[in-house]
Structures are given as structure tokens and as C-alpha cells.
Design a protein with these regions (language model features):
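Conserved substrate/cofactor phosphate-moiety recognition/catalytic segment
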Residues: 24-81
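P-loop (Walker A) phosphate-binding loop of NTP-binding proteins
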Residues: 21
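Walker A (P-loop) ATP-phosphate-binding motif of ABC ATPase nucleotide-binding domains
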Residues: 15
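Small-molecule kinase domains that catalyze NTP-dependent phosphoryl transfer to phosphate-bearing small molecules
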Residues: 131-186, 194-196
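Hydrophobic anchor at the beta1->P-loop junction of P-loop NTPases
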Residues: 18
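Conserved phosphate-donor/acceptor-positioning beta-strand/loop module used by diverse small-molecule
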Residues: 105-127
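Short glycine-/polar-rich loops that comprise or flank the Walker A/P-loop
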Residues: 79, 105-110, 167-171
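Pre-Walker A adenine-sensing motif
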Residues: 1-8
């Protein structure tokens, strides 16, 4: 078990998979946890956008992104860093990869999912954010080089949410329509951190 010092207390290294739909607040929550509790964020949108920006075709960038994210997360955990893997978790390989990294390294595994009771609440959020090249551009425009997989933004987001995977037990679902502060507090409590 990796231990490192935070203030005057030691705590264990943790690998957190943070999942949810585009616009659900995953990255915001990931960075808030990182700032409050000394975690490193591995953001798949940053990795995928970098790959696409360097000339990798959109259709090939997904698998390469997840492989890079898992490899980077594994390396950081091996260095004793607590990691938040910020990515929608719709693929079994990604879920199993995170579980495997934690198991192989002998560190705690945690999983947090941001869920929305009605995906229509995400549409204004998508319009309001500044998106990266790999991300859904707005409520009317999918990620560049792609189409809405199920015809419309709302239908696609609804299907994507149903496809989200999580471990069988020991995970936390947060309502993405709750306040950022409330979700941060619940996440930190789940992770065993105190937010001051």
C-alpha cells in the first residue's frame, strides 16, 4: 500500500474513475477534488484532443486515448500519486483497466459517476462551455468529424447514459443537477477526505 504525506496526516494512494456524460460536470468535479485533496487528474478529453490535433483520425483516436490514459494513470499510481481518471466509462476495457491498475499496484480503487435524471438539462451546459476538438461542440453540434449516434443530441446523450458502466459495488452516484459544492462534499466524504 502506497502512503504519502498530506499536511500532518498520511493517507493511502487512490485511483478514482470519474464517469458521466458530456456536460455533467465531470472535469469540474475532478479538478475540484484534485485541488482539495492533492490528486492528479488524467483527462481523456485533453489526451484525445491532442491526438486529433496531431493528425490522428477521429475514428482512431478513442482506443489510443484510453490506452494512453490507462498507461499514464498506472505510471502515476506507481509513483505514489492519487489519480482521478476523468472519462465517460462506456467501455468495459476502461472499467477493467482501472480496476486492474489499482489491484496490481495494491492501492484503493474508487468510482464516482455523475448522473442526470433528465439529459435535457445538459443541453444548455453544452452550449455554454468552451469545448475541445474532441468534445461535443454544443447542444446542436456533435464532436467535430462525428454525427449524433442516435439521431439527436438528447437521444444520443440518453443512450450514452444508459451505456455507462460501473463496478458491481462500492461506487458513488452523484446527481449532476445538484450544486458543485454539494457534489464535491459527497465525493470527498466518499474518498475519505475532509474539505475545509
Amino acid at each position: 500500500m502506497h502512503l504519502h504525506r498530506t499536511g500532518t496526516a498520511y493517507r493511502c494512494t487512490v485511483l478514482v474513475q470519474l464517469s458521466g456524460l458530456p456536460g455533467s460536470g465531470k472535469s469540474t468535479l475532478a479538478y475540484e477534488i484534485a485541488n482539495a485533496a492533492d490528486f492528479v487528474v488524467v483527462n481523456t478529453d485533453v489526451l484525445k484532443s491532442s491526438l486529433i490535433g496531431s493528425g490522428v483520425d477521429v475514428s482512431d483516436a478513442g482506443a489510443a486515448t484510453y490506452a494512453a490514459a490507462l498507461g499514464l494513470s498506472s505510471d502515476l499510481v506507481a509513483q505514489g500519486k492519487s489519480v482521478i481518471l476523468d472519462s465517460p466509462c462506456r467501455y468495459r476495457d476502461l472499467l477493467e483497466g482501472g480496476l486492474s491498475i489499482a489491484s496490481d499496484a495494491g492501492v484503493r480503487y474508487a468510482f464516482i459517476e455523475l448522473w442526470v435524471p433528465n439529459v435535457s438539462v445538459l443541453l444548455p451546459r453544452l452550449d455554454a462551455r468552451t469545448s475541445r476538438i474532441s468534445q461535443v461542440a454544443s447542444a446542436t453540434d456533435p464532436a467535430p468529424g462525428t454525427t449524433w449516434e442516435f439521431g439527436t443530441a438528447e437521444a444520443t446523450l440518453g443512450e450514452w447514459q444508459e451505456q455507462l458502466l460501473h463496478p458491481r459495488e462500492g461506487w458513488l452516484r452523484l446527481d449532476a443537477t445538484h450544486t458543485k459544492a454539494a457534489n464535491l462534499q459527497r465525493a470527498l466524504e466518499y474518498l475519505g477526505q475532509q474539505h475545509h
